[in-house]
């Protein structure tokens, strides 16, 4: 139900979990202190990212089809994060927590991922951001073309 089965793997640098049917939380993931890449795909019971903020070395976070996650607030504490993929994850409350992610270079939130508050302004304040991929939605503050132009200008 959490990351406790991995507790003795502190030297692990990359972890890809494909269809972890029992995973409900990120509790215990902090024991993977050298982890630089974490990918979770089709984690149908995972409903919170709380605990992920303990991964001080994490550079790449990929969430694919993790549809119960509504908040990305814990991601804000990942100071070395350069890539964040949140693809086909349903409804995300806001991307405002990313406003402090100064090292973030890539942010993909496409397919069914839908930012409920529609505020994409935080992307414009990220000094390292080079790539942002998302679907155009009527209530979003910016179109993909507007964000691309701002990032390349």
Which ranges hold each PLM region?
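Concave beta-strand-loop units of leucine-rich repeat
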Residues: 1-93, 97-153
């Amino acid at each position: 139900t959490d990351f406790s089965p991995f507790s003795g793997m502190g030297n692990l640098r990359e972890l890809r979990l494909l269809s972890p049917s029992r995973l409900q939380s990120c509790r215990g993931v902090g024991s993977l202190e050298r982890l630089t890449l974490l990918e979770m795909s089709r984690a149908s019971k995972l409903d919170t990212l709380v605990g992920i903020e303990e991964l001080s070395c994490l550079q790449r976070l990929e969430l694919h089809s993790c549809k119960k996650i509504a908040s990305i607030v814990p991601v804000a504490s990942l100071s070395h994060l350069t890539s964040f993929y949140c693809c086909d994850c349903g409804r995300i409350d806001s991307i405002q927590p990313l406003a402090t992610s100064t090292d973030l270079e890539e942010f993909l939130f496409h397919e069914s991922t839908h930012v409920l508050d529609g505020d994409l302004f935080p992307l414009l304040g990220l000094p390292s951001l080079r790539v942002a991929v998302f679907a155009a939605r009527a209530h979003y503050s910016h179109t993909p073309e507007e964000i691309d132009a701002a990032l390349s200008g």
